[in-house]
C-alpha cells in the first residue's frame, strides 16, 4: 500500500511517499524528467546490506555510484569535492539527478551537492534509517561539517521527492533504531504528548503496525512545522530541542563516540533539567523524559569525562543557531517550548554545564 504526503515549500513542493516498492515512485519521477543520468550516493554499510538493490539500479538506469565511508566524517567538503569530480567526469548536466540512499549523513551530503552543483540540480532522498525517515530527510536542510563544527556549511534545498520504506528498518541495529526513536521522542515531548506516551510504552511490545503509525505521526508533525516555518524563523526552532548541546558533544567527540540521536538525548535532558530549574517544566515531566530515553538504552548523562564545561562552551559559542552575542537553548515547557537566549559571557551557563552534566 502506497501513501503520499505533499509538503508545501516556498522553493518547491515535494511528496513524501510511503511504499514498499521504491521503484514505482522513482520510475514515475524519472519518466517526467525524460532521458537523464543518475548518481546514486550511499555509504559502504548500506551498499553491503543492499547490493542486489544497487545492482538493479545499475541495470534499470543510466547510472553511476558513489560510495562514501560510513559515519559523520564523510559529511565534509572533501567528500563533496570527490562527488563533484565524479559528476564532472561523467558529464552530468543540470537536468540530471542525484539519488541519496542512506541515513542522515548521506542525505545531508548528497542534498548539499545537489544544491550547489550547477547552482542546483534535482535530487531524490531514499532514507534508510529511522532517524532520517522521521527527521533529517524532511524540510530541506542540507549541509556538511567544517573544521569539526557540526553542519556549519549548508542551505535549505528541498528534495524533489522522499521515498520512505519501512523495509529498510529491518536491518537497523538496535543502536541505530534507538537514535531514530530519540528524534521521535523530541517531537512527541514538544508537540504531541500522546505520541510521547506511545513511545514510552512501545519497548514492551514492539508492535510493527504501531511503529509504522508512530513513524507516520512523527513525519506529519515534522511536515506541519516545516510548512509553517521553512526557514526557521520561530516554530521550526522547536525541533532544535537538545541540538545546541548535542551538536557541541558531537563536535568534541569528532562525530564518533556519540551518534546524533545519542548526543541530542543528552542535550534534551540537559535542557529539560534547566527548564525545571527555571520553573518551566515539572520534575515529573523531566523524569518521564529520562525514562523514555532509558527505555531505549539512550544516554542521559555525559560519559565522556574528557569533555570539560569550558570545551563545550567554546563550541557552543560557534553554534549556527546563536543570535548575536547569545547562545540559544530550546527549553521544554508543560505545554510546548520556549527559546532561551543566554549571553555568551554569562557565567551561569558554565555553572549549569558543570552541575547539570556533572562534569568538571
Curated annotation (Swiss-Prot):
Record-level GO BP terms: amino acid biosynthetic process; aromatic amino acid family biosynthetic process; chorismate biosynthetic process
Localization per Swiss-Prot or TrEMBL: Cytoplasm
An example Gene Ontology CC term for this record: cytoplasm
Residues where NAD(+) binds: 104-108, 128-129, 141, 168-171
Enzyme Commission number: 4.2.3.4
InterPro entries: Dehydroquinate_synthase, DHQ_synth_AroB, DHQ_synth_fam, DHQS/DOIS_N, DHQS_C
Cofactor binding note from Swiss-Prot or TrEMBL: Binds 1 divalent metal cation per subunit. Can use either Co(2+) or Zn(2+).
Organism: Streptococcus equi subsp. equi (strain 4047)
Pfam families: DHQ_synthase, DHQS_C
Keyword presence, Nucleotide-binding: yes
Family: Belongs to the sugar phosphate cyclases superfamily. Dehydroquinate synthase family.
Annotated PANTHER family: 3-DEHYDROQUINATE SYNTHASE (PTHR43622:SF1)
The protein's required cofactors: Co(2+); Zn(2+); NAD(+)
Keyword field: Amino-acid biosynthesis, Aromatic amino acid biosynthesis, Cobalt, Cytoplasm, Lyase, Metal-binding, NAD, Nucleotide-binding, Zinc
CDD domains per the UniProt record, alphabetical: DHQS
Known catalytic reactions: 7-phospho-2-dehydro-3-deoxy-D-arabino-heptonate = 3-dehydroquinate + phosphate
Keyword Metal-binding: yes
Official protein name in the record: 3-dehydroquinate synthase
Enzyme class: lyase
Functional pathway: Metabolic intermediate biosynthesis; chorismate biosynthesis; chorismate from D-erythrose 4-phosphate and phosphoenolpyruvate: step 2/7
Protein's job: Catalyzes the conversion of 3-deoxy-D-arabino-heptulosonate 7-phosphate (DAHP) to dehydroquinate (DHQ).
Amino acid at each position: 500500500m502506497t501513501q503520499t504526503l505533499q509538503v508545501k515549500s516556498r522553493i518547491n513542493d515535494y511528496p513524501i511517499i510511503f511504499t514498499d516498492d521504491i521503484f514505482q515512485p522513482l520510475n514515475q519521477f524519472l519518466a517526467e524528467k525524460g532521458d537523464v543520468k543518475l548518481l546514486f550516493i550511499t555509504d559502504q554499510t548500506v551498499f553491503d546490506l543492499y547490493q542486489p538493490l544497487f545492482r538493479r539500479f545499475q541495470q534499470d538506469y543510466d547510472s553511476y555510484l558513489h560510495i562514501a565511508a560510513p559515519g559523520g566524517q564523510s559529511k565534509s567538503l572533501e567528500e563533496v569535492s570527490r562527488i563533484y569530480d565524479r559528476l564532472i567526469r561523467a558529464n552530468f548536466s543540470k537536468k540530471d539527478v542525484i539519488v541519496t540512499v542512506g541515513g542522515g549523513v548521506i542525505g545531508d551530503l548528497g542534498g548539499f551537492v545537489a544544491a550547489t552543483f550547477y547552482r542546483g540540480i534535482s535530487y531524490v532522498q531514499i532514507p534508510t534509517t529511522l532517524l532520517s525517515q522521521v527527521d533529517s530527510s524532511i524540510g530541506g536542510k542540507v549541509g556538511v561539517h567544517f573544521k569539526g563544527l557540526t553542519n556549519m556549511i549548508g542551505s535549505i534545498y528541498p528534495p524533489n521527492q522522499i521515498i520512505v520504506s519501512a523495509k529498510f528498518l529491518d536491518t537497523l541495529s538496535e543502536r541505530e533504531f534507538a537514535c531514530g526513536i530519540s528524534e521521535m521522542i523530541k517531537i512527541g515531548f514538544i508537540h504531541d504528548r500522546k505520541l510521547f506516551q506511545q513511545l514510552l510504552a512501545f519497548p514492551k511490545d514492539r508492535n510493527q503496525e504501531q511503529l509504522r503509525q508512530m513513524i507516520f505521526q512523527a513525519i506529519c508533525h515534522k511536515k506541519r512545522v516545516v510548512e509553517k516555518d521553512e526557514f526557521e524563523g520561530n516554530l521550526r526552532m522547536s525541533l532544535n530541542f537538545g541540538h545546541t548541546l548535542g551538536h557541541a558533544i558531537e563536535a568534541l567527540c569528532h562525530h564518533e563516540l556519540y551518534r546524533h540521536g545519542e548526543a541530542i538525548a543528552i542535550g534534551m535532558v540537559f535542557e529539560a533539567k534547566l527548564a525545571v530549574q527555571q520553573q518551566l517544566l515539572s520534575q515529573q515531566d523531566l523524569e518521564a523524559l529520562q525514562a523514555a530515553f532509558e527505555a531505549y538504552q539512550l544516554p542521559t548523562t555525559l560519559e565522556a569525562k574528557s569533555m570539560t564545561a569550558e570545551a563545550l562552551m567554546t563550541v557552543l559559542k560557534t553554534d549556527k543557531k546563536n543570535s548575536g552575542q547569545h547562545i540559544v537553548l530550546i527549553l521544554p515547557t508543560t505545554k510546548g517550548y520556549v527559546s532561551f537566549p543566554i549571553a555568551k559571557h554569562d557565567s551561569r551557563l558554565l555553572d549549569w554545564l558543570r552541575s547539570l552534566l556533572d562534569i568538571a
